[in-house]
Every structure is written in structure tokens, then in C-alpha cells.
């Protein structure tokens, strides 16, 4: 194991250790399936799958005679047919059978029939946080979406309040600030006045509405108060005569006051606009918007008589016709329908998150009601009006308090909920339709909807992704990814700048650096190192509690909502050993503002400087000296590093390397402490200290050269010897891209920042032949090729070495069964599996028929359908798999067996391969120079790599220079360093190390030209830099074609390597040749060399016969154009110079020949 020297400004030990980096996956799935509780026979909590079944059951028949009750569910572990390794080999899913125990109760007789009902299979999560579906490892990415709850925002001149449920109809209120009216919309349909909506929900009079929203004050009516009352609004109705009522909400005129006095009205109730804040716990308003809506109502219903109240019928009809169109049956039904939209648990669910957000916003204690209440609607309207009046502030939609994370468990719960609601519908139908008393529980439950929904989710959902398995870091990052796309999320095209941007609440929760460059920027992000997801789905980050200016070791996890307005100090603030701040003023942040505060005003302190960035970014040493754009590229490119045969851990690391290797699941850790009794390259056996018997041994199977999802090699190498004592969790075997239990993505190289004869112009890289000879960047790539042996209508296909019309030389690589031998080196076009398919009679040529009639036997009636090595692939066959029906039990219909061949290729570094450092400094290898020609140091040491110094200043990634300097010192002192991000080694510290290693403190040295032996004019910056080989290899991109497939319609060559395509002579190339006046060259290129079908054949014949040729017909694209014009209704014909019609189709040719 490597001993690292800590070279940071902070302490070596952390206040809080990092959590398990894939716990977001493991915890979420455990919450969903509760496997631990099932194993230990503990009662299950009402969450995840259990909550789905509890919601659906009990089911009752419509006549109330029969009830189907749920007792429990369990997983049948005996039903797991294959291990994880076998599933990958055989293309199966790693899953178990799910059963539920149901009781069918006959309420009339009291009889109960119990049965365990099969509910399909459920994929199980591996301990690495992945699923194996159809032989491929997949990851369910967590989704970040708009949180249910209430949100207030403004767009243009409109103020909005939106209540978003977890399931159900959206309710939206909007104030049009130009007209001062408040409207309501349900599910973004047509808007209606809010007063009509309130009336429909039960506040059916003006008085009730005013009483709900406004503070009311009593005032005496006399000559002294006349002036004060004039222009005010009535809060209650006043009836003077039988037919004369002054309505609540009407404006009082002087004439009205005279009427009051004449009719003996002594006291009236007025709306008190100024007293909106005077009653604690009441959210009264000071706006007249609701009163304007009353006026608008009058206009809407054309009430000529100003003293009438609206009838219930007219209100219900008006609301129902807009919100729930289609003629209602009756007023009562209309009212009922409207109420069920928001107040029925079947149709509406705020979710515990939505209820929590509503209660938090309006200061309520209720955390249990899952539907909307009248109080919620009133509070929302009041709050919106208070915002409109400037008494409250708008919400920030991009605040992480308004966005939450849905992980695997919740996504699966929703899938099961949807499927079970269909199951419920079918069961209820069957309960009412069948002869009830002959029923068994399993006959009521249809399992099809559940099976298909789960299958569809894992196979096709946008959030179920093929795992990025290039290296352990890519794997880990993929499991920690947050995606704003997917079902119920945003779409790339509609997502604006604000959603993608970094927000202050991302601090410690989401990484501001790691995100893709391109259309997904800011929509796909990564979890920060210490971040966790709480029970409500909000992201939390840990802080140390500060009490009376003293820092404690108490850790509190805060969500973005809890953190608002708290004063938080940075992790690198100077603190004495007793927990007191050493400075009088400490740098702090409060919400999005940065300032300084006295220690006594501080609430919390960051746990670690690396808490605000993701795992990939935390692996970049001297991150704070890099420009953010380059840090982003550095984070992303580390994930593309190919695992090498002989990697080295970086001399300059950040302390995260060991943690990443451990949590990624690619290394093997000891489960219990003990002694190694066997260590081979296939398995390790450890006898634990607390073994209960001689046979109680821990066995660990090692993967040897297995293929990953991205065709890289997954290989374990043993780190322990026989007899060695190991501790619990000690790393006993390295995986791909790890060395001594640390992440090792590349190698340490001696670098000079020097231009060299133009070979490293524009980010190109010059490397020494030593790197290639010593296999420093050699990687193994494994490709899988498979073929199905099918049952055809004419008989079965056969795997055989007896293939018609194939030379013995080609067949020499196959064994007697027609399968390539393991260890054979194969090249493009070689046969891997010999397979023959029966021919139909129609395929037989006249010559064959002649032979058959002469010899009286069927000449070979099969055709060659063998699996061949595709273009651009060569390598050694390392494994062949035969999968038959006996092995797996369920092959696709019509398939007898599947054969898979694995070909491994050792790829050395070559010109055209892409390399990169950890600071976004990427380039392509332009030349591999013999060692003797490389520039060398005064002691004769040649450089390994030359990088262009012009790649540094404009890119502003100075981190690479500091890394090179410290790496140089480390190499010569034989030390490895930990340089944690945001508290890196200082310049002074680096210079000290360089001096100790015997170098100039600038790390500049005199270099000598390898060609001439002369020193270069100036000193050159020399160092040791950590370089990676990326998964963009020239071998995968190189492509050549002479002839190949053509597009069916245009008869032009296909494009791209995958289709074995060619190059297209496009519009611009034609212009270039036209500009030269190269008419004959152009004609040849546009006809016989391209898509003139008859010309192509003719020119080939002429070349074979050796005749000089000058043929050119009509290009096929011209025919396509003609047919398109005909399709538009133009009758077109074409004629040659002599006026003869040229046929475009065979049918035309026949017609012309006839005439």
C-alpha cells in the first residue's frame, strides 16, 4: 500500500468521513423493497412497495359481499436461477419472484380463502447499486424535478400562484396587473374569476368571501363619520326595504349614507384595508382585487338589478362549463365532481412532500392531510395578493427547496402504483361479473399489467440507462448522477438558461462544475461529495453547529429550506484547538450573499472544503487554480480514461483516490478479519478469526478479463499472499484502473512544456517511444460477437464446419463443430462461427437445377450464413459461449441456441489517440519519437512527453503547472502527496520540496536537443504530470472502404463507419470542381462513380474486358427528383438529343418499346 504525505493547508483528518458514495442508490432501493426487514421478519414500514399494496387493498365488490384483503408480500430467494456473473454471461436478468399473500373474504358467510399470489419478478439491486437486465448492467439515474407544493412567481405582468400535487390536477391562480382581476385555472384550461370558484367551493355569498379575506371594522353612522365612510366598502349586506339591499363589497356613496340615516341604520361593518397585519395567525389582505372580481361578476352575468346575490345554479354552471367541460347531469353532480377534483383521495394526492411544503409556507402544523383543504386555497389566494401588494416576496423556482430528487425506490413505487391501479380495476370487474362463490384469490388478480410495466421501465425508460463502465470513476459518477430530463421532467428544447444555471442553494448539494458540455448542460448534474437525500427527497448537506461563537463537533444535515437566512462560515476559517475562531471577523455566507461576521453571529460552519463539489472534481489537484470551464472538462475526461495494463497511482493525488476505488465496488474487500489460506489468480480464500468451524471460510471469486459495457477489460489482480493477516474492509484485490487499492487512471510522465518542431502545435502531443515499448498506455479491449441459430420454415439452421464454397485455409481456424478455436488470432473477414441455413426452392439457380437433373441428387441446398469478423476488428479469441434452451430455459421464440465469441485486442498508444491530464488539458498524439531524439535533461534523462506551453495561458488551467512541479519533487524524493482541493499546497511548500529534490525552485531546467545535443536557448519548465489515455482511440475511428452498401433510394453510398459507409460528393464539392471547369471529371464523379446504376455495371464490364470507356447514363438521384415532381402532380418526360424519350422506370421502358 502507498503511504501518502498530506500537503494541504488544513488538517489531514476530516471532521466527518465521506458517506458511502453510492448510498443514494442502495438506501433508496432498500426503502422500496425493505429486504433487511423481510430477512429479519420485522414488521414492514408503510412505504415503497408495502405502501402500494396497502393503498390498493382491501378491494370490495360492488355489492359488498366479497372483500380481497392483503396480508404481506415476500421475495422468493430460491427463484433466483443465476448468479450475477451467470446473468451477464447468459444474457439473463438478475431478479427474484415477488408473491403477495391475499385473503378472499365472503362477508355473508364469513369464509376466508388464503393464497400466495404470484406478482411477477422484480429485478434485484446488486451490492454495487446496479441492476442486471438481459445480461447488461444498468443504472437507474435519480431524477430532479419540480417539488409538489405551492409556488409563487411572476412572468411579464402576471403574478402566479401554482399548487402542484404529487398526483392530480394542477391549480393555478393568476393576477393580471393591468386589469387588477384574480383568475383561477385548473390543469391550464380556460381561466375563470376566483370569486366564482370560491362560491362553487362553498363560500357562496359575498359576505362569506369578504369575511374570509378581509379584516372587518364596525363604525357608527352619523354626521361626524360621513366623510370617513364615503368611498369605503361594505363588509356585510344591509337591507333597508324589502326589495332594497346594499351588498357586501359595494362602494358607499354619500347618497347611501343619507339612506342609512333615514332608515335608522346606526352601525355598519366596513372592510379594514389597513388592518391586514393586526390579527396574529390571520393572513388578511389589503388589496381590492377581490372586490374588482365582484364587479366583473356582475358584468359577466349582466345583473341589472344591483341588489341580487348570484344563484348557486348559475355559479355552478359557469364554473363547470369552463373547468370540466361537457354538460353536467345536475347541479348536485356538478358540485360533487368539482369537489372530488381536489378533495378526494382517489383523484388527488399532495404527497407527504406537498403537504410539508404547504404547511411550511403557511405556518401550519398539519403534516398528514394528503388532499387540499379550503384553508390551503384561502391561504394561497391571500399570500398571492399580499405579494401583489408588496407585503411578501416571490419564490425562486430554481431554489433547491422547490426541486426534489426522485431516486430508484420512488420511481419504482410510482411504476407499481400505476400498474396496481389497473390490476384493481380488473379485479373489481371480475368480482362483480363471475360466480362469486367459486372464486379463488389468484383468479381475481391479473399479473400482466405489473409484469409489463416493470419490464418496460427497466428496458426502455429514459432514466434506466446502460451503465457507463469505462472505468470505476465513470461507474460511480453514473450512479450519483441527477437528471432533470425524463418522464415528468424538463425537455432539452424548452429548458431555459435559469434552470441550467448554478444557484446558491447548490452549495454542498449539487456540483457546480461537473455537467456535460452540449445541449444537456446544467440539466444533468452530479451529487456533491457529502450530499444526501432526505425523507422528503430534498438534498441535504452537513454542517458543524456553532454555539455562541464556538465550533462544536455536532453535525447537522440541512436542506436548502432549513439553510435559508442562516449564517454559515467556510470550512477553512481559522479555528483554535478549543473551537474558538481566531479572527474577529469571519468570512461567511447568508443565503446567496457573502460577507464577514463576528463569531457570535455564526450559526454553522462547513464540514470540509470539498463539500461543494462532486467526486470527479474532487480528484483534480490544485482545482482552485484552474478556470471553471477547464475543470469541467477535466472532471468529464477522467470518466473517459481507459483502464491500462500497468497503471500507476498519481504522485500528486487529492486523498479521494482510495475512497473512490473502495466505494466503486471494483476492488475486493475482506468481509471479516482473518488469515489468507489460498491466493490464486482465480480466487482468494480467507479463514476468518471468528470462524465457527473448519469449513467457515470466506471465498472471493476474481473476474479475469471480463468484458464491460464499453468493451474495456475488467480484471482483478491479487494484492495478498498466502498466510497474510488481513483486517476487515482491507483491499485484497485490485480491479480495473486501480493500483494498491487506489484509483489509478493513467501514468506519471516526465513532461517538458516546449514546442518541438511544430509537432505539438495546437494541442497536439509529442511522446517518447519508451512509453509505447514499456506498455505504459497499453489497454485491453474485448468485443463480443453473437449469432442466433434459428428454426426456419425450411428446417433448422446448423452450426458446422462444412460450409459450401469456402476454402480450406479459411476453415483452418475452426474446430470440427465449426466454432473458432480459443487462442486463435483472427482478422477482418475470418469466419468465427460456421452456420448454414436451408435454401428455399426459389433461391436455386438454373445451373443448380441442371446439375440436379443430371446427377439426380440435390446439390448443396444450403447457404452460408456464418458469423464473420467485421471490418476494422482483429484480435485473439479468448472465449466462446454456447447458450441453449437447457441452459436458460427461455430463449427468444424460434431461436435454438445463441453463440457468443469474445475477441480481445491489446492496443498500444499510437498516433491519433487522445490523451488528457486532469485539468482539461487534452490533445491528440501527433508523433511518437525515438527515445534518443527526445529532448533530455542535463543528466541525460529524456523527456516522456512534450506539451505546448501555449496551451496554458489562454486556458487558464495553472493547476497542471503546479501539479508538474510537485510531481517532479515527488518522483525524485520517492514520495506520494495528498493535495486536497481548496486547501492545496502553497507555492512556498512546493518550492521547498523542489529544493529538497535538488531542483531549481521554478522547476525550470536546461534541456538539450536530442537531434543535435545542443542546449535549447531558454530554460524549459520540466515536471511530472499525470496523463490519461481516453476512450477515443484512433483504431475505433479509422475507416476505409472501396465498395460497400448503397442507399436503396438514392443509390449513393451510406455514411459512417457503423454502416461501412463511404464519402459523399456533396453540393459544395461540386461547386469546387465547377470552379475549376473540370467538366469531365465532374461528370464521371456524379454518374458512374456514384449513382448511375447502368453506367456502373457497364464501366466494370469495360474495365474487365480492357476496352477504353466513356459511358455515363442518368444518375439515380435525378430519377428520384423526377418521381418527387411527379408525386406533386407534374407530368414530366425526358428526351435525348435526338428527341427520343428516355424511360425512367421498367414500366415506361415496356410502354416505349411497344409504341
UniProtKB/Swiss-Prot annotation:
Keyword annotations from UniProtKB, A to Z: DNA-directed RNA polymerase, Nucleotidyltransferase, Transcription, Transferase
GO biological process: DNA-templated transcription
Organism superkingdom: Bacteria
Keyword Chloroplast: no
The reaction(s) this protein catalyses: RNA(n) + a ribonucleoside 5'-triphosphate = RNA(n+1) + diphosphate
Pfam families: RNA_pol_Rpb2_1 (PF04563), RNA_pol_Rpb2_2 (PF04561), RNA_pol_Rpb2_3 (PF04565), RNA_pol_Rpb2_45 (PF10385), RNA_pol_Rpb2_6 (PF00562), RNA_pol_Rpb2_7 (PF04560)
Entries under HAMAP family matching the protein: RNApol_bact_RpoB (MF_01321)
UniProt name for this protein: DNA-directed RNA polymerase subunit beta
Species this protein is from: Borrelia duttonii (strain Ly)
Gene: rpoB
Amino acid at each position: 500500500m502507498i503511504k501518502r504525505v498530506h500537503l494541504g493547508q488544513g488538517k489531514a483528518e476530516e471532521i466527518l468521513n465521506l458517506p458511502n458514495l453510492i448510498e443514494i442508490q442502495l438506501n433508496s432501493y432498500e426503502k422500496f423493497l425493505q429486504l433487511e426487514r423481510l430477512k429479519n421478519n420485522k414488521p414492514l414500514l408503510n412505504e415503497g412497495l408495502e405502501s402500494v399494496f396497502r393503498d390498493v387493498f382491501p378491494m370490495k365488490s360492488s355489492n359488498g359481499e366479497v372483500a380481497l384483503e392483503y396480508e404481506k408480500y415476500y421475495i422468493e430467494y430460491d427463484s433466483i436461477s443465476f448468479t450475477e456473473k451467470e446473468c451477464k454471461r447468459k444474457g439473463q436478468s438478475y431478479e427474484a419472484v415477488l408473491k403477495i399473500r391475499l385473503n378472499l373474504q365472503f362477508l355473508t358467510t364469513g369464509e376466508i380463502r388464503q393464497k400466495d399470489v404470484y406478482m411477477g419478478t422484480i429485478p434485484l439491486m446488486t451490492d454495487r447499486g446496479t441492476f442486471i437486465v438481459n445480461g447488461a448492467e444498468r443504472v437507474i439515474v435519480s431524477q430532479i424535478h419540480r417539488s409538489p407544493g405551492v409556488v409563487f412567481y411572476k412572468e411579464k405582468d402576471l403574478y402566479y400562484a401554482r399548487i402542484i400535487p404529487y398526483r392530480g390536477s394542477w391549480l393555478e391562480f393568476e393576477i393580471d396587473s393591468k386589469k387588477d382581476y384574480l383568475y383561477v385555472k385548473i390543469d391550464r384550461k380556460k381561466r375563470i374569476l376566483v370569486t366564482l370558484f370560491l362560491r362553487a367551493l362553498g363560500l357562496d355569498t359575498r359576505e362569506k368571501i369578504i369575511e374570509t379575506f378581509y379584516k372587518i371594522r364596525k363604525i357608527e353612522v352619523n354626521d361626524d363619520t360621513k366623510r370617513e365612510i364615503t368611498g369605503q366598502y361594505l363588509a356585510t349586506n344591509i337591507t333597508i326595504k324589502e326589495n332594497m339591499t346594499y351588498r357586501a363589497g359595494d362602494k358607499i356613496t354619500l347618497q347611501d349614507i343619507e339612506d342609512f340615516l333615514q332608515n335608522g341604520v346606526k352601525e355598519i361593518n366596513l372592510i379594514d384595508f389597513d388592518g391586514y397585519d393586526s390579527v396574529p395567525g390571520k393572513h388578511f389582505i389589503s388589496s381590492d382585487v377581490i372586490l374588482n372580481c365582484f364587479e366583473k361578476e356582475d358584468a359577466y352575468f349582466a345583473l341589472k338589478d344591483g341588489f341580487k346575490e348570484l344563484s348557486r345554479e348559475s355559479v355552478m354552471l359557469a364554473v363547470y362549463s369552463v373547468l370540466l367541460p361537457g354538460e353536467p347531469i345536475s347541479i348536485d353532480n356538478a358540485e360533487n365532481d368539482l369537489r372530488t377534483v381536489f378533495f378526494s383521495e382517489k383523484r388527488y394526492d399532495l404527497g407527504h412532500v406537498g403537504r410539508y411544503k404547504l404547511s411550511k409556507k403557511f405556518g401550519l402544523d398539519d403534516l398528514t392531510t394528503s388532499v387540499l383543504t379550503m384553508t390551503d386555497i384561502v391561504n394561497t389566494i391571500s399570500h398571492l395578493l399580499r405579494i401583489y401588494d408588496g407585503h411578501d416576496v416571490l419564490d425562486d423556482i430554481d431554489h433547491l427547496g422547490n426541486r426534489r430528487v426522485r431516486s430508484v425506490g420512488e420511481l419504482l413505487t410510482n411504476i407499481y402504483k400505476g400498474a396496481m391501479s389497473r390490476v384493481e380495476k380488473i379485479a373489481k370487474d371480475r368480482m362483480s361479473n363471475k360466480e362469486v362463490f367459486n372464486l379463488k384469490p389468484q383468479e381475481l388478480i391479473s399479473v400482466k399489467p405489473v409484469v409489463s410495466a416493470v419490464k418496460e421501465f427497466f428496458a426502455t425508460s429514459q432514466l434506466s440507462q446502460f451503465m457507463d463502465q469505462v472505468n470505476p470513476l465513470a461507474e460511480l459518477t453514473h450512479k450519483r448522477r441527477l437528471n432533470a430530463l425524463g418522464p415528468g421532467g424538463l425537455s432539452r428544447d424548452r429548458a431555459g438558461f435559469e434552470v441550467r444555471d448554478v444557484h446558491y442553494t447548490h452549495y454542498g448539494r449539487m456540483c457546480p462544475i461537473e455537467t456535460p458540455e452540449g445541449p444537456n448542460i446544467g440539466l444533468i448534474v452530479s451529487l456533491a461529495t457529502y450530499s444526501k437525500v432526505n425523507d422528503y427527497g430534498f438534498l441535504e448537506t452537513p454542517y458543524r453547529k456553532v454555539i455562541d461563537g464556538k465550533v462544536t463537533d455536532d453535525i447537522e444535515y440541512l436542506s436548502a429550506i432549513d439553510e435559508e437566512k442562516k449564517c454559515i462560515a467556510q470550512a477553512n476559517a481559522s479555528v483554535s484547538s478549543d473551537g474558538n475562531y481566531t479572527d474577529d471577523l469571519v468570512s461567511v455566507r447568508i443565503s446567496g450573499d457573502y460577507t464577514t461576521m463576528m463569531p457570535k453571529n455564526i450559526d454553522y460552519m462547513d464540514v470540509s472544503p470539498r463539500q461543494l463539489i462532486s467526486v470527479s472534481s474532487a480528484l483534480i489537484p490544485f482545482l482552485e487554480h484552474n478556470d471553471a470551464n477547464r475543470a469541467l472538462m477535466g472532471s468529464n475526461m477522467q470518466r473517459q480514461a481507459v483502464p491500462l495494463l500497468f497503471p500507476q497511482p498519481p504522485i500528486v493525488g487529492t486523498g479521494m483516490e482510495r475512497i473512490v476505488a473502495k466505494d466503486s465496488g471494483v476492488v475486493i474487500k475482506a468481509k471479516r478479519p482473518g488469515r489468507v489460506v489460498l491466493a490464486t489468480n482465480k480466487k482468494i480464500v480467507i479463514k476468518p478469526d471468528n470462524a465457527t468451524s473448519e469449513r467457515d471460510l470466506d471465498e472471493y471469486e476474481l473476474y479475469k478479463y471480463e468484458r464491460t459495457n464499453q468493451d474495456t477489460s475488467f480484471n482483478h489482480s491479487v494484492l495478498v499472499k498466502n498466510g497474510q493477516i488481513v483486517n476487515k474492509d482491507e483491499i485484497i484485490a485490485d480491479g480495473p484502473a486501480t493500483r494498491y487499492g487506489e484509483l489509478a487512471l493513467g501514468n506519471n510522465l516526465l513532461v517538458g512544456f516546449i514546442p518541438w518542431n511544430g509537432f505539438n502545435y495546437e494541442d497536439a502531443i509529442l511522446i517518447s517511444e519508451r512509453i509505447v515499448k514499456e506498455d505504459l498506455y497499453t489497454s485491453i479491449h474485448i468485443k463480443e460477437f453473437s449469432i442466433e441459430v434459428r428454426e426456419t420454415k425450411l428446417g433448422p439452421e446448423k452450426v458446422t464446419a462444412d460450409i459450401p464454397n469456402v476454402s480450406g485455409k479459411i476453415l483452418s481456424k475452426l474446430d470440427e463443430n465449426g466454432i473458432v478455436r480459443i487462442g486463435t488470432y483472427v482478422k477482418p473477414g475470418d469466419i468465427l462461427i460456421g452456420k448454414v441455413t436451408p435454401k428455399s426452392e426459389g433461391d436455386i439457380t438454373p445451373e443448380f437445377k441442371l446439375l440436379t437433373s443430371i446427377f439426380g441428387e440435390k446439390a448443396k441446398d444450403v447457404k452460408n450464413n456464418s458469423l464473420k469478423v467485421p471490418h476494422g476488428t482483429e484480435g485473439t479469441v479468448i472465449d466462446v459461449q454456447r447458450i441453449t434452451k437447457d441452459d436458460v430455459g427461455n430463449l427468444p421464440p424460434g431461436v435454438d441456441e445463441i453463440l457468443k465469441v469474445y475477441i480481445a485486442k491489446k492496443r498500444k498508444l499510437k498516433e491519433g489517440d487522445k490523451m488528457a491530464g486532469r485539468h482539461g488539458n487534452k490533445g491528440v498524439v501527433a508523433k511518437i519519437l525515438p527515445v534518443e531524439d527526445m529532448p533530455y535533461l542535463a543528466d541525460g534523462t529524456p523527456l516522456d512527453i512534450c506539451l505546448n506551453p501555449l496551451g496554458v495561458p489562454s486556458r487558464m488551467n495553472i493547476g497542471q503547472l503546479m501539479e508538474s512541479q510537485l510531481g517532479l519533487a515527488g518522483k525524485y524524493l520517492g514520495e506520494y502527496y495528498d493535495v486536497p482541493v481548496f486547501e492545496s499546497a502553497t507555492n512556498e511548500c512546493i518550492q521547498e520540496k523542489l529544493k529538497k529534490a535538488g531542483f531549481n525552485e521554478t522547476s525550470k531546467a536546461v534541456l538539450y536537443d536530442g537531434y543535435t545535443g545542443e542546449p535549447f536557448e531558454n530554460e524549459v519548465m520540466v515536471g511530472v504530470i499525470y496523463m490519461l489515455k481516453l476512450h477515443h482511440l484512433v483504431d475505433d475511428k479509422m475507416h476505409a472502404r472501396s465498395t460497400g452498401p448503397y442507399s436503396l433510394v438514392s443509390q449513393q453510398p451510406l455514411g459512417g463507419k457503423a454502416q461501412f459507409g463511404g464519402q459523399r460528393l456533396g453540393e459544395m464539392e461540386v461547386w469546387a470542381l465547377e470552379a475549376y471547369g473540370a467538366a469531365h471529371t465532374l461528370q464521371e464523379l456524379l454518374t458512374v462513380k456514384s449513382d448511375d446504376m447502368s453506367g456502373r455495371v457497364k464501366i466494370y464490364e469495360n474495365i474487365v474486358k480492357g476496352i477504353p470507356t466513356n459511358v455515363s447514363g442518368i444518375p439515380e438521384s435525378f430519377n428520384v427528383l423526377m418521381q418527387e415532381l411527379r408525386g406533386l402532380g407534374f407530368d414530366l418526360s425526358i428526351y435525348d438529343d435526338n428527341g427520343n424519350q428516355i424511360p425512367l422506370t421498367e414500366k415506361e421502358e415496356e410502354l416505349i418499346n411497344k409504341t
